[in-house]
Amino acid sequence: NMDRAPIIAIIGQGSTKRLHKESHQIMDSIRMCEPISKWSQTILAAENITEIVRKAFKIAEAEKPGLCVVELPEDIAKVQIDDTPMSPTKVRRPGADHKAVAQAHELILNAKNPIILAGNGTIRKRASNRLRVLVENLGIGGINTFMAKGSVSYKDKHSLFTIGLGSGDYNNLAIDESDLVIAIGYD
């Protein structure tokens, strides 16, 4: 999941009584999914369903978002449970470090040819409007990655459009000529 989309995959599995042996349609799905997922877990007891599913959502949505796999064996899936979903926990994000903000401000003020590189995080965190205001107020050119297309509007006079893979792209030249790259939401 290179695009950093939060995904929950709930996959089936044979009965827990057959997991330890070679059996028809039994495979180690969790081990197979580990290299491509942020977290993978088998539900081995029905009373753990709510907790495991909630944890999967929390991990999938946390920075950097990605795939979480929950494996549900057929015998556990048949069990009726008397449970209610857990309430989401509100998390307050810490504020920025004042010294780091002051240093960044100083770097921007002293840069002769700065450029903003906008990544997918600007889309995920719905920061495009604030980014556009920043680009306009600072008068700094802005480049989008493929997954951040539109975070700096192509209609804006400061837009340098979307950066690609080509080594001869004008956008790459703009970055090469820059004395400060301000990466915002870039993974």
Regions found by a protein language model. Give the residues of each.
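N-terminal alpha/beta PP-like core and its mobile active-site loop of ThDP/TPP-dependent enzymes
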Residues: 1-187
